[in-house]
From Swiss-Prot:
Chief place of localization: nucleus
Skewed-composition ranges (Polar residues): 293-309
Full protein name: E2F transcription factor-like E2FD
DNA-binding region extent: 13-78, 138-217
Organism of derivation: Arabidopsis thaliana (Mouse-ear cress)
Effect of a null allele: Increased root length and smaller cotyledons. Reduced root meristematic zone but longer cells in the differentiation zone.
Gene: E2FD
Length: 359
């Protein structure tokens, strides 16, 4: 029983997907104080096998998010290194553009991974544009390079939509390959990781309803929750709870909402927001006692004629504040607080009456 209690919590079948695993991985290591991390440490903290962590870091390494620094050791580069890595991948992919991208839209098989020194299987008319075969065919089958080639399909294509069938035919070898199903599954893993990072999104072709992926780019990573830890430090010190006696409206939370705009704030009026007046506006304000020294706000024993006769006007910044506080009275009202204060007032008056009777 003790050994079971000390055993790390493992993922369920649903949580074993690389899309979920990479989200937990980024939550664990996407911090400004992380420079190096080990595969064994990550596997122990996330409760998965080390090979699953190895798959994650290989895919993340393909876009420059991490870099290998030693045996089972990786350095965290952060999302700031992703745009530069994508730019380098695009530059490399443009050199191979005639060998990959133009044939993806035609659903033709371009890149093949075969044993031996066999060239890419292109048509005779297209072989003059094909690059020279790479000597290291074993490296072509790595997850890292497969992820890079998958990204190149989007970076070097005129259309941001790539079907999964086209990507499979462009990157994998279907003819007489017993491991084709395994390779397709690896390509699915790569797509799931990039989808969870909001680098691409799952969709379908409107005409054929075939599964496809749309390229979103590195900007969407920063717009979503996968941002650098240093960039999110400004939001960590914002209190989530209000202090007693302050406004019920959380102004900072309203500003952080994506759907909130200046027009919406103007439409809502001054009910739940405080009025901020610039110093330039305060200098131009000339309060008039005739406008605000009336009604219930007029002190007892004063009159309009008396004030105007004596030419009494508030002076300085204090007078401006007094005038503005009278002109712009907040319309915010909490009925619960008013009821509570009325109850206290009634109780206090009853105590005064009883105390007067005793005397």
């Amino acid at each position: 029983m003790d050994s079971l209690a000390l055993a790390p919590q493992v993922y369920s079948r649903k949580d074993k997907s690389l899309g979920v695993l990479v989200a937990n991985f980024l939550t664990l290591y996407n911090r400004p104080d992380v420079d190096l991390f080990g595969l064994d440490d990550a596997a122990a903290k996330l409760g998965v096998e080390r090979r699953r962590i190895y798959d994650v870091v290989n895919i993340l390494e393909s876009i420059g998010l991490v870099a290998r620094s030693g045996k089972n050791q990786y350095s965290w580069k952060g999302f700031g290194a992703v745009p530069r890595a994508l730019s380098e991948l695009k530059e490399e992919g443009m050199k191979e553009k005639f060998a990959i991208v133009p044939f993806v839209a035609k659903s033709e098989m371009v890149v093949y991974e075969k044993e031996g020194e066999e060239s890419f299987m292109l048509s005779p008319d297209d072989q003059e544009f094909s690059p020279s075969p790479r000597p290291d065919n074993r490296k072509e089958r790595t997850l890292w390079l497969l992820a890079q080639n998958f990204v190149k399909l989007f970076l070097c294509s005129d259309d941001d939509l790539v079907t999964f069938d086209s990507a499979t035919k462009a990157l994998l070898n279907e003819s007489q390959d017993m491991n084709m199903r395994k390779k397709v599954r690896r390509l699915y893993d790569i797509a799931n990781v990039f989808s969870s990072m909001k680098l691409i999104e799952k969709t379908h072709v409107p005409e054929t309803k075939k599964p496809a992926y749309r390229w979103l780019g590195s900007k969407t990573i920063f717009e979503n929750r996968f941002i650098d830890g240093s960039a999110s430090l400004c939001d960590r010190n914002v209190p989530k709870k209000r202090a007693f006696g302050t406004e019920l409206t959380n102004v900072n939370a309203k500003r952080n909402k994506s759907g909130c705009s200046k027009e919406d704030s103007k439409r809502n009026g001054n009910q739940n927001t405080s009025i901020v007046i610039k110093q330039e506006q305060c200098d131009d304000v000339k309060p008039d006692v005739k406008n605000f020294a009336s009604g219930s706000s007029t002190p007892a024993g004063t009159s309009e004629s008396n004030d105007m006769g004596n030419n009494i006007r508030p002076r300085g910044r204090l007078g401006v504040i007094e005038a503005l506080s009278t002109l712009y009275q907040p319309s915010y009202c909490n009925p619960e607080l008013l009821g509570l204060f009325a109850h206290y007032n009634e109780t206090f008056r009853s105590y005064q009456e009883e105390f007067g009777r005793e005397k």
